[in-house]
Amino acid sequence: GKRVVLLRGASADIIMLAPGETFAISVGGCPIGWIFDPQKPNRLIVGHMGLQCLIDRQLIVAGQKSRKYRSVIDRMWESMNLLPMEASRIQAGYAFPIDPLHYVHQWDYPDSGDNNKRVCEYIAANFGNKCIVDWNNPETRKLGRIHLGNLIRSQYASLGISVENIHGVSTPNAVDVDGHPLWYVTRGPHGKDPRNLVLVTLYQ
């Protein structure tokens, strides 16, 4: 019969779907991502891909690992039990990351500015300059505008997934009749309370 399973914390960050199952998550700017093997269509792995899921912040700022995996994407890949030679056929994607122009990690921010700088430098060095908006400009890079979509794309590509098989959907810019955003983000005008309900289904 039908059943609902509620997950919280780290156990909710990834889930393997079978045909006919649906994954639901409420988000406020964090993207969701997925990995799919067309040769094994009876499973789809879905993950929550907020920044803290994509990098080990404690390792970056304090030099101490806080978990086994660098990123939730690495954990998803292992869960799929795929060989490196199989990566070229894999389909992967993400949806609804916060606009990087709103996702600011300023280097001069009181108390956390130095750590913001370390995080941005780590991301640029390990995943490419395109993960930080205007990284090549010494002044604008200090705004620390992290592009989660490009960070996810870079991590997928590092696994050997073909660029043409990586799909991304940006956060909608839709507004209501009064000009207010219809897509909630925690750093937007609606504040931290509203959320968006995202559903992912693997059809039979």
Map each language-model feature to its residues.
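Active-site microenvironment for binding and transforming phosphate-containing groups
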Residues: 1-204
